[in-house]
């Protein structure tokens, strides 16, 4: 998909701050520092619309990005980051849970997982939670540029096995560096919102 418009529409922590818009939404979930912001930037061909950071826990709000006036990407705070207070982690958890459970415009969650490693316990909990609430999931196996192409199938199989992946949930191999998987990711996203 050719992106001609991409802008941060809204930053929210409470439902009353969500954008008053009928646009379908696709949320990005993943552990802290897995590359959610880099994914957004690569998908829209922009270097810095979504702020990236070497410091885990940078995203602390729900960030709604309007893409071509046809959908919102919703960047949510990363999970599994230990260096914030328990109180902050609980507040983030409630904020994310409220959004994922109550937002009618939400059509799918892109669960970003580092292809180099087996999914973490937090990845597994998030996937199970999304499946419990019957939220469609597109798994983005990112950072594929960091391992030889010949090893991709083995790593994808590991991800599917550890998550006990539902047959209907696609896994897209992706790289924010090279753009591998970008077209496949757009195809899966557009299918989810149609």
Swiss-Prot record:
Name of the gene encoding the protein in the UniProt record: engB
The protein's name in its UniProt record: Probable GTP-binding protein EngB
GO biological processes: division septum assembly
Keyword tags: Cell cycle, Cell division, GTP-binding, Magnesium, Metal-binding, Nucleotide-binding, Septation
Organism annotation: Halalkalibacterium halodurans (strain ATCC BAA-125 / DSM 18197 / FERM 7344 / JCM 9153 / C-125)
UniProt cross-references to Gene3D superfamilies, sorted A to Z: P-loop containing nucleotide triphosphate hydrolases
Domain spans labelled EngB-type G: 22-194
Binding, Mg(2+): 37, 59
Family label: Belongs to the TRAFAC class TrmE-Era-EngA-EngB-Septin-like GTPase superfamily. EngB GTPase family.
